[in-house]
Amino acid sequence: MALTLKAMEYFTTALRHGNIAKAAVELNIAASAISSAIDQVETEFDLTLVTRQRARGIQANASGREVARKCERLLEEYQSVLNEGAELRHALSGTLRIGYYAPIAPAFLPPI
């Protein structure tokens, strides 16, 4: 199974909060979805990336911090691509055609 952007977002949000429940509230989803995303990321890398403790929440180990850092960078780049695409949609494009009335054109246009 391939790692999804959504799983990366859930994983990094959970680590940023240090708590699955708080991440679930921020993302407006069930805590079980966050937990499943963390499992998916760990399965994809075949590593244990976080330590889960009921009283303390979750903490990333060294591998988890590295994966989270790279996931955050990838998510930021993805958002940047989306923003640039939106800007391109609103950019001017096409051919500009200029018409003129020949008898008065010399008064307004530079000589060629």
Language-model segments: residues:
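N-terminal winged-helix
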Residues: 32, 83, 89-112
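Alpha-helical linker/hinge and terminal dimerization helices associated
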Residues: 44-45, 67-89
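Residues within the DNA-recognition helix of helix-turn-helix
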Residues: 30, 36-40, 112
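Short helix-boundary/capping micro-motifs
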Residues: 13-30
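A short LG(V/I)-centered, amphipathic sequence patch enriched
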Residues: 42-60
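Short alpha-helical "packing" element that flanks the helix-turn-helix/winged-helix DNA-binding module
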Residues: 10-14, 67
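Residue cluster at the C-terminal edge of the helix-turn-helix DNA-binding motif
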Residues: 17, 26, 40-48
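The N-cap/first-turn positions of alpha helices
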Residues: 4-7, 31, 64
